[in-house]
């Protein structure tokens, strides 16, 4: 399937809009004042996010949830939980992509020849907050078997609820 660059750019902009909205909503849920900044980023969002509102929103969002010293690259139990949860979600999204007859390698924005899951990487973006919410509320001090098993529950529950609403 081939589609024009404008169409891909429009879809990517919508994905980023939903991602920032979901981040904002999670911050509001936890009564974080930084949610107002994400409102501003939503207003400033342009086609294809050429001004990198997604990046700015992510910095504000993660700092609001996990503190200003938090970085996604640090080897911490929180990051391990986030990475594990995101991987579970990505595999679920990829399973849905394949089961509907689409190819996972061809992405909307993600376009890396070494990433066999470019489309899944695009589509999972607005869903990451489900994992973020779980990790924020549990704040793991270690990341082992029990923490991995616990992360499977909210992911499975969300997947099941999506199918229930379709019926």
Annotate each PLM feature.
Residues 120-126, 134-135:
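Extended, well-ordered alpha-helical scaffold/bundle regions in very large, multi-domain proteins
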Residues 113, 133-152:
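Accessory, usually C-terminal, subdomains that scaffold auxiliary metal cofactors
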Residues 6-75:
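Internal, conserved structured core segments that host functional sites
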Residues 81-87, 91-95, 99-103:
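Conserved mixed alpha/beta catalytic, RNA-binding, or beta-rich assembly cores of soluble enzyme
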Residues 110-117:
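Small-residue-rich helix-loop
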Residues 71-80, 104-110:
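Short, solvent-exposed helix-loop connector elements
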Residues 159-167:
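Single conserved hydrophobic/aromatic residue that forms the stacking wall/gate
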